[in-house]
Amino acid sequence: MMKKSLCCALLLTASFSTFAAAKTEQQIADIVNRTITPLMQEQAIPGMAVAVIYQGKPYYFTWGKADIANNHPVTQQTLFELGSVSKTFNGVLGGDAIARGEIKLSDPVTKYWPELTGKQWQGIRLLHLATYTAGGLPLQIPDDVRDKAALLHFYQNWQPQWTPGAKRLYANSSIGLFGALAVKPSGMSYEEAMTRRVLQPLKLAHTWITVPQNEQKDYAWGYREGKPVHVSPGQLDAEAYGVKSSVIDMARWVQANMDASHVQEKTLQQGIALAQSRYWRIGDMYQGLGWEMLNWPLKADSIINGSDSKVALAALPAVEVNPPAPAVKASWVHKTGSTGGFGSYVAFVPEKNLGIVMLANKSYPNPVRVEAAWRILEKLQ
């Protein structure tokens, strides 16, 4: 009996110590500062905003300048260019269109753009565009493609290197086209559909494709070789890399994607789940719609090395997950993003109710971002 009581007491002590070990706001701040302050110095980053979602609650931290010339500090309202983290918005909006019955990932691309008459487009589905597996679409749409006619000409003349689904080659020209075609049945522009179906329902009031005049004061300058820059307009930019947002809105975005049960709109809730479904396996990584996932727990090396451009931008064999596997809570879900003057990173583990947003007004190497995020979240889990 004594043995049993002692055992129970030990178990209770262990379980209570787990709760007692919950971090205070000051402890979270210390953990974040110890990683971010030296990172900013080493990478010469003018300004950063970070949100940590710990036990489901957001904590915000800001450093440095949003505008060096005018001495404007980074605040919780500062707008940063998200770069390719914009693709996660594209994936969720596409998932919402699927949930509404407007599109199917199995649909041929030509159903939504009949003018694509080239033979190479036969057999390419929306799924392939959304997951970079169409057969080798290029990373960027060429700069001289400036209107819809030139865009059609570009896609008509593109020739695949592989059969659809053979390899994954990360490409703005792939998921960008998916986003544009996914909203066609709605009759809305991409920006309008994103605003009505994703941003407004999630109350992301400071997330923009086109930053309005009254928000320009909060729009940070990015810095490239010390010079202030903003992203240049381009074809399918909104769909691939065109979103700007604040650290508060991005924390809300992570919370919604980490646990969509509080999202009122059923199609959006389903869209969030579809974006984290697993459509292809590429090594340790699973490709979703915009989001990329790895099984949790994992070793730091697998995400840090996987984020290096030599791996992330390489053509790698893709194994189809058929039928797609539904979202897995025990996952490291993440996305990097860059423009000429900005670098962002978002990661979360739904099972742990733990996530991070890192926004910087300078582009710096992806592995450095991922390692910093890992170090912070590892200390908080």
Swiss-Prot record:
Reaction catalyzed: a beta-lactam + H2O = a substituted beta-amino acid
GO BP terms: antibiotic catabolic process; response to antibiotic
Binding positions (a beta-lactam): S84, Q140, Y170, N172
Entry keyword annotation includes Methyltransferase: no
Induction note: May confer resistance to poorer substrates by high level expression.
Function (record text): Class C beta-lactamase which confers resistance to penicillins and cephalosporins. Has nitrocefin-, cefoxitin- and cefoperazone-hydrolyzing activities.
Protein name, entry field: Beta-lactamase CMY-2
